[in-house]
């Protein structure tokens, strides 16, 4: 298990429940922490963050997957491969493949949406962090999700809000069809389900970040949650020392 600060770690692969290859990196030893990336992104987004560096320095084992449809993982072109919480099932399978009995999960942005659903399905998660997220994802008809799902559909008419996302996705050679299906079938976790979570959860967000709703409302919906507000906007807060400090303190 190599340790690499600020550079992309070596990718490994496992075959998920439906035959899709899922890429991941696995660095360090100690208590396992899974980092779950956001939309139009992949696991390498964590490489330049303070939190990944400090987790490794403090002796944690850091596991970083590329969610299906992203990065080096499989990008199937049929819609059926993105339904029924497929991404969550991939992560459950990865944890089993790596023989993790208890572990920690840190999600950011859309990664927090995936992590929230995972929390409701897997008792092996000891602690978790939901970063850059409010309560809006609990609505199955969330207009922001639908807006971006439609934007990534073939031949879609773009709005001022979605033009930038499409341009960025093209610039990083992301798979537009996969991104469409990922948004269309994004997991939904109800407020009731959040209220049933028994493990400890940290909600952390930048003070300029309301892109996905009010993070304090998410904190209030999860009984055993803590809340940390740090400086920063949605795209920058998770890279900062303040984000890392909040998480490292929570994990002690």
Model segments located where?
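Catalytic active-site module of serine/aspartate enzymes centered on a nucleophile-bearing elbow/loop
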Residues: 231-252
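Conserved acidic catalytic loop of the alpha/beta-hydrolase fold
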Residues: 85-102
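The serine-hydrolase catalytic nucleophile loop
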Residues: 40-52
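Short beta-strand/loop motif that positions the catalytic acidic residue
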Residues: 197, 203-205
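Conserved alpha/beta-hydrolase
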Residues: 55-74
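Conserved loop-alpha-helix segment in the C-terminal half of the alpha/beta-hydrolase fold
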Residues: 207-232
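Flexible "cap/lid" loop of the alpha/beta hydrolase fold
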Residues: 113-124, 128-155
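Short beta-strand element of the alpha/beta-hydrolase
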Residues: 31-38
